[in-house]
Amino acid sequence: MSTNIWTPRHILSLAEFTPTEYNIILQTATSFQEVLGRRMKKVPALQGQVVANLFFEPSTRTRNSFELAAKRLSADTLNFAPGTSSLTKGETILDTAMTYLAMGTDMMVIRHRNAGVPAAIASAMDRNGHQVRVLNAGDGQHEHPSQALLDLFTICKLLNSTEPRIELLETKKIAIVGDILHSRVARSNIWSLTASGAEVHLAGTPTLLPKYFGEFGKLRPSKLFVHWDIEPALEKADFVMTLRLQKERMSQHLLPSLREYHQLFGITRDRLKLCQPGVKILHPGPVNRGVEISSDLMDDPQLSLISQQVTSGIAVRMALLYLLGGGKADQ
């Protein structure tokens, strides 16, 4: 792998990523996916560096994926558990981060229920001249960059397994359906998919898809559309991304019932008939079977890319950690 291919910086949002930067990540992830296919699934790219996974919010896929990615790169890992940490004794989040910094941490992967926490920690590190890099692993309803990047990688690899690149999506239609209001995944995917040139259609109930989401479209003219009915979004779609109803983030009763939601916006075989032949389904997980997607569709290998998304996540997160670490070590 070439050296110095990336200017090391924090990854907090995809809002200002360029197509070139997306392609660097896709190409780097492709190299690491090849590594993961070997008998010895480990390279010394980050040997001697320390990655701290600071997850202030519960996570299964993202936390384990980042931990495994770091270990596959030979980094040392520190894993934070809020229930057994000094937070229970009144320590601030910033002081917790500074403690990990004092232990020699080179990169911090941070998840928090409140938007802006990773950015605040990154800003504090910069103000004090520390070289540690911060990667946003999901902050409130703001963004989840690594999830959107693994979604992008999964789609592009399907379109070209040897040379995935963002330009492959220029003629594609992608529907994002569900609880978009509370979804940090949706926000990051809006940035990445519209940057690719894809036509992105959002669909959800008016309570879960406020009209202001159309404002994103002003930054990417004629590439983002908002629908309060599912049919226009699915019509001739090449990919359908369905999102979990995040009941834990809902401050009020936004839906009459889960059954009615499934009737109106659930992905079923009948609804997929509106899409292009060969349509594929994505979901960031965890999935509420029978709510946002019919259980049989989730398990159908001809339609579902959900397992591939989880697998892709390791290679993509290896790429992100490698690039944040300087991209200088030989594999």
UniProtKB/Swiss-Prot annotation:
InterPro entries: Asp/Orn_carbamoyltranf_P-bd, Asp/Orn_carbamoylTrfase, Asp/Orn_carbamoylTrfase_sf, Asp_carbamoyltransf, Asp_carbamoyltransf_Asp/Orn-bd
Keywords per UniProt: Pyrimidine biosynthesis, Transferase
Listed GO biological process terms: 'de novo' pyrimidine nucleobase biosynthetic process; 'de novo' UMP biosynthetic process; amino acid metabolic process
Binding site for carbamoyl phosphate: 61-62, 111, 144, 147, 285-286
Recorded GO MF terms: amino acid binding; aspartate carbamoyltransferase activity
GO CC terms of this entry: cytosol
One Pfam family this sequence matches: OTCace
Catalysis performed (reactions): carbamoyl phosphate + L-aspartate = N-carbamoyl-L-aspartate + phosphate + H(+)
Pathways involved: Pyrimidine metabolism; UMP biosynthesis via de novo pathway; (S)-dihydroorotate from bicarbonate: step 2/3
EC numbers, comma separated: 2.1.3.2
Record-listed L-aspartate binding positions: 89, 184, 244
HAMAP family: Asp_carb_tr
Chain's role: Catalyzes the condensation of carbamoyl phosphate and aspartate to form carbamoyl aspartate and inorganic phosphate, the committed step in the de novo pyrimidine nucleotide biosynthesis pathway.
Family: Belongs to the aspartate/ornithine carbamoyltransferase superfamily. ATCase family.
Subunit structure of this chain's protein: Heterododecamer (2C3:3R2) of six catalytic PyrB chains organized as two trimers (C3), and six regulatory PyrI chains organized as three dimers (R2).
Protein name: Aspartate carbamoyltransferase catalytic subunit
Species of provenance: Trichodesmium erythraeum (strain IMS101)
